[in-house]
Structure formats: structure tokens, C-alpha cells
Design a protein with these regions (language model features):
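Flavin-dependent oxidoreductase catalytic cores
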Residues: 1-173, 177-193, 198-201, 206
Length: 208
């Protein structure tokens, strides 16, 4: 025996598609035949940005779909959609909006996110920017890349930073996320790093 999970959109979120009311009926029809409802949103043809919320949408913008469907069924309900804040995920479950919170892009950004939460190291989490670099790279090359995790797609090469054979003085121009990570990596390899930033604070666009 194994659990059966069904992923569907609580609403297709466009005129002519089915709405949340019909999403509830779909869930009720499936309820006796499956073990868990995985509630997403939108469609790939129309509403890709609803299925995969970008940085321009509120965190948890699709949770209401799972929350409403959960009121009408007796089996566990999962939610998904650009969630990357452990405190928000905990609130979703604790408040009964969903029984399970799924992550995808958040684990590309930081594969160790669940472990860090379990070890009370939330401040060490590298958060997904919801910038779609991973989606664009897959379309272009068939693999993945991530703005905040340069090791994604290079797992077979190993993720250990090796000491440089020749130590150099390295100049990094720009103290945004990429520059900071480059400086950190170069320093780990043993180089002498100088980081230059024209603004008064590090972080690039993130500091805003």
C-alpha cells in the first residue's frame, strides 16, 4: 500500500477557467479515492505566475485556495507556491489553513532549509528570491541555476570548495548577493579578497 496524492489547481484564475467553487467540487469528488490533495493555482498555459508566484506577489498568495478546500473535505490538504519563510509555513499549519506545506524553489536556493529549521538555525537559511532564474535556465539548457545557490546543477562536480593552488589578491566589484557570495567563496579558497561597494551598505537591492 502507498499513499495517493493528487495535485490540481484550486482555481485556474482566469476568465473561462474553473473557479474556486468548482475546485471545491473537484476536491470533494476525489476525496474518497485519494489520500492527500495538493492544491496549487493557475495553469501553465495561462497563469504561470500564479502557479509559481514571483517576487512581485505576496508570500502565501495561493494559501487561501487550500484553506477553503480544506473546509470541505476530510483528508489532508497541502499548499504550495513560492513559500520560503519557516515562520509563515508554521503559521499556515498551526492555523489549520493546510496540513502540509510544500517547497520547490526554496530547496533549490537552500537544500538544507528543513535541517536548519530543525536545528533552530533559521537565521542561516538562504532564502529563494522568487526571481525565476531557475525556470529560465531550465527552458534554455535543460538544467537548473539559482541566483543565490551557484552549486545547483553542479552536484556531480562536488560541493566542496577546494583550496586554490595559487593564492591571489582578488577584487570584487559590488556588494550585492552575487558579489558577497563570490567574496566569501574566494576567501574560503584562500585568496586575499577586497570587496568594493559604492553604496554605504552591503546587500544590493536586497537591503531595500
Amino acid at each position: 500500500m502507498f499513499p495517493i496524492e493528487f495535485r490540481f489547481s484550486g482555481s485556474e484564475l482566469f476568465e473561462g477557467g474553473y473557479d474556486l467553487e468548482e475546485g471545491v467540487r473537484i476536491a470533494q469528488t476525489l476525496e474518497s479515492r485519494i489520500d492527500l490533495l495538493h492544491v496549487s493555482a493557475g495553469t501553465y498555459q495561462r497563469g504561470f505566475g500564479d502557479t509559481h508566484p514571483s517576487m512581485f506577489k505576496d508570500h502565501g498568495c495561493n494559501v487561501y485556495l487550500a484553506a477553503e478546500i480544506k473546509k470541505h473535505v476530510s483528508i489532508p490538504v497541502a499548499t504550495i507556491g513560492g513559500l520560503n519563510d519557516p515562520a509563515q509555513m508554521e503559521e499556515i499549519i498551526a492555523s489549520g489553513k493546510a496540513d502540509v506545506v510544500y517547497m520547490a524553489r526554496a530547496l533549490l536556493a537552500d537544500p538544507f532549509l528543513p535541517r536548519k529549521v530543525m536545528e533552530n538555525r533559521s537565521e542561516d537559511i538562504v532564502h529563494c528570491l522568487r526571481c525565476f532564474t531557475c525556470m529560465a535556465e531550465r527552458a534554455a539548457t535543460g538544467t537548473r541555476r539559482c541566483t543565490v545557490n551557484p552549486l545547483i546543477g553542479r552536484e556531480m562536480e562536488g560541493d566542496e570548495v577546494q583550496p586554490a593552488l595559487v593564492k591571489k589578491k582578488v577584487l570584487i566589484a559590488g556588494g550585492g548577493p552575487g558579489g558577497l557570495y563570490a567574496a566569501w567563496t574566494a576567501a574560503r579558497r584562500g585568496h586575499s579578497v577586497v570587496l568594493c561597494e559604492k553604496e554605504v551598505a552591503l546587500g544590493g537591492i536586497l537591503k531595500s
